[in-house]
Amino acid sequence: MTTPQKVAMQPITVEFPLRGDWTAVHTPAEKVPSHGVDVLGQTYAYDFMKVDWGKDGFIFHDKSTLRFFTVGVSVNDCYGFGEPIYSPVKGEVVMVEDGLKDHRWVHPIKDFLAMLVRSLYMWLSNKPNLHKIIGNYFIVKIDGMEAYAFFAHTKKNSIKVNPGDKVQYGQHVANVGHTGNSSAPHLHFHLMDQPNLLTAHGLPCNFSEYKAFNDGVWVSKRYEMPAKREQICVKEA
């Protein structure tokens, strides 16, 4: 795997890939690389989760905190699980990997240990099975540029496109899942310069339009990157 050189680049503007209220738990608005590593083209990657803003703390499920830290919660009790993903770009699908089962339960300690094992496997293996690491995923080449949109951890058998398919802005392409190296249901999204994950370099992107809840009011945002744990919203078209 190559390590890309970080250089100043203008962000590519795309549409927001989700609808309703979400938050970015990892975002290049906070730091670059956003996930702490320059691998798999994820230098400028986002992780989006759905949480309950009416509860204290960062709560992404409808069970008690005690239950979460003891026995865990079912993936079906997590707010974002199964939510539709919409294409933020116009382009052609170049790769699809689906069929991996979603993790049935979410538990902070067990998930951390499982993610650690999978990460070590990727680093130590000469030919890592990326499907097991990334979960279900697909890649779209954006029309008119050498840029590729990458979507990961999608729900089993929810990807609605195949290699060679043309996708349009706002097209329902998959559903949020909990597959691969995932600690809770979320969408991992980033842009990169080629479809080969092992050699790809990340490309920055921002979003054409969304709203952010700041200081008690909703503020319209255009061509910006959401801040970490900022409440953001995109209404249905």
Which residue stretches match the model-derived regions?
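A residue-level detector for short acidic-glycine micro-motifs
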Residues: H26, K50, M95, H153-K156, ...
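Short glycine-rich loop/turn motifs
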Residues: T43-A45, G82, I134-F138
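Acidic, glycine-rich catalytic/binding loops that coordinate metals and/or anionic ligands
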Residues: T23, P33-H35, I59, P128-L130, ...
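Short, charged beta-turn/beta-strand-edge "cap" motif at the junction between a beta-strand
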Residues: D98-K101, V173-S183
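Short, small/polar residue-rich loop motifs at catalytic or cofactor-binding pockets
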Residues: Y79-F81, I133, I159-K160
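Terminal presequence/propeptide segments associated with secretion/organelle targeting
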Residues: M1-P33, V39-G41, C233-A237
